[in-house]
């Protein structure tokens, strides 16, 4: 197979990613912050651990400033909405992300 849409879906996923997601789904499977039960708290801890690891990697002082979005389009749009004001103009080319 020749897969030409890697930027959209990151296929194939690295085995470690598949293993971690499978383990989370089998062992925890709860929504973080949705409740106070053990699995919900554990889900929240897992996400916070990921925030800490990314904060360390990118030299971000406060791990709570690391956010997760559904995909690159959502992340880029959120960043732009935080930077732009009404009346601002954005110039792009055909080479930019299509969000």
Where do the protein language model's features map onto the residues?
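Pyridoxal 5′-phosphate
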Residues: 1-99
